[in-house]
């Protein structure tokens, strides 16, 4: 059975989801029926075809009136600001992938269901009252048929949660800190401009900019036992894609660098294959652009202090890796039943 999806919001993640679907060869499993985006159709088609981070899309793209043609496929374009007015029932939508970055509450999810969708997957963290928050590879197997409003967490949560789980099971985590070194995002100005967050009034290309992050809360959402045991900070850096995460954890078992790297390498080749990758090469951020993994462990940067303090550096393409997990979670939601 082919899952019929709609994409609500055709920005960085929405376009990456569509491109990832075509590039990953999963069109027999998932079909994009419609896209709802307030921007004009000509701009939607242009930005799908030409992308500053991911290059030119390999499929032929053209737009006519309210239709987007991708290869031989026809996708309906909608420009409806009110979720309750979307024609999901008429179009037979199984799952809405809400990539707007605006919606994320249970009420928002229920509005999509009222419009006729069977299930909703938010491409960002949602409220505590959602049916589930999924980090694919860690807890997607817990999805049930009555989980109709689901969050796919965040790109950074998807990156770091598998590593935390692996280190905790092997060595027993007592507490930890996380520093996210994140590429610039579209909530930052090209030149100085007004913003509620005074640090984000500054030009994105000119500074390393500390910003707020809810990553610690995201860790606790997946692993409640770590409540008040993790803290996180985040800085934005003048690159347009790819993020690095510096994870430090104190553990109960004595350990050395070789043991940590062996554990993570084994997981990348085994239980987390396709989700976690592992590199021993002297790479830089641009080398991980367009990488579909949630996390890539840089073993050259693993450190252990006093046998009980572990520091790891983990890379991710915060757009492409997350977009691929959106597709994985969509299929997992479908497998759990409607």
From Swiss-Prot:
Gene3D superfamilies: Dihydrodipicolinate Reductase, domain 2, NAD(P)-binding Rossmann-like Domain. Substrate binds at residues 154-156, 200, 213-214, 236. InterPro entries: E4P_DH_bac, GlycerAld/Erythrose_P_DH, GlycerAld_3-P_DH_AS, GlycerAld_3-P_DH_cat, GlycerAld_3-P_DH_NAD(P)-bd, NAD(P)-bd_dom_sf. It is an enzyme of class 1 (oxidoreductase). Its main location: cytoplasm. The record marks 182 as: Activates thiol group during catalysis. SUPFAM superfamilies: Glyceraldehyde-3-phosphate dehydrogenase-like, C-terminal domain, NAD(P)-binding Rossmann-fold domains. Pathway: Cofactor biosynthesis; pyridoxine 5'-phosphate biosynthesis; pyridoxine 5'-phosphate from D-erythrose 4-phosphate: step 1/5. NAD(+) binds at residues 12-13, 318. One of its GO terms (cellular component) is cytoplasm. It holds the Pfam family Gp_dh_N. The active site is at residue 155. It catalyses: D-erythrose 4-phosphate + NAD(+) + H2O = 4-phospho-D-erythronate + NADH + 2 H(+). One of its GO terms (biological process) is pyridoxal phosphate biosynthetic process. It comes from the Bacteria. Keywords: Cytoplasm, NAD, Oxidoreductase, Pyridoxine biosynthesis. NCBIfam families: E4PD_g-proteo, PRK13535.1. This is D-erythrose-4-phosphate dehydrogenase. It comes from Yersinia enterocolitica serotype O:8 / biotype 1B (strain NCTC 13174 / 8081).
């Amino acid at each position: 059975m082919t899952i019929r999806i709609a994409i609500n919001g055709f920005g960085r993640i929405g376009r990456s989801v569509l491109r990832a679907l075509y590039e990953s060869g999963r069109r027999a499993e998932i079909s994009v029926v419609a896209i709802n985006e307030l921007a004009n159709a000509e701009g939607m088609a242009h930005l799908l075809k030409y992308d500053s981070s991911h290059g030119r899309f390999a499929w032929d793209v053209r737009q006519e009136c309210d239709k987007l043609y991708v290869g031989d496929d026809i996708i309906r374009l909608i420009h409806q600001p009110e979720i309750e007015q979307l024609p999901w029932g008429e179009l037979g939508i199984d799952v809405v992938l809400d990539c707007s970055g605006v919606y994320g509450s249970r009420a928002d999810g229920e509005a999509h269901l009222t419009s006729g969708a069977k299930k909703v997957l938010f491409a960002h963290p949602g409220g505590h009252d959602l049916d589930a928050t999924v980090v694919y590879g860690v807890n997607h197997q817990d999805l049930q048929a009555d989980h109709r409003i689901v969050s796919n967490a965040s790109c950074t949560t998807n990156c770091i949660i598998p590593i935390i789980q692996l280190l905790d099971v092997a060595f027993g985590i007592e507490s930890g800190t996380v520093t996210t070194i994140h590429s610039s995002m579209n909530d930052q100005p090209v030149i100085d401009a007004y913003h509620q967050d005074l640090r984000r009034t500054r030009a994105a290309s000119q500074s390393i900019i500390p910003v707020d992050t809810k990553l610690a809360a995201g860790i606790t959402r997946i692993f409640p036992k770590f409540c008040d045991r993790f803290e996180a900070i985040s800085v934005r850096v003048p690159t347009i894609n790819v993020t690095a995460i510096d994870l430090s954890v104190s553990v109960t078992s004595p350990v050395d660098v070789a043991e940590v790297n062996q554990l993570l390498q084994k997981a990348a080749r085994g239980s987390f294959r396709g989700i976690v990758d592992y590199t021993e090469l002297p790479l830089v951020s641009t080398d991980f652009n367009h990488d579909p993994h949630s996390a890539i462990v840089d073993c050259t940067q693993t450190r252990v202090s006093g046998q009980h303090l572990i520091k790891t550096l983990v890379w991710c393409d915060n757009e492409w890796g997350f977009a691929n997990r959106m597709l994985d979670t969509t299929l997992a939601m479908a497998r759990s039943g409607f």
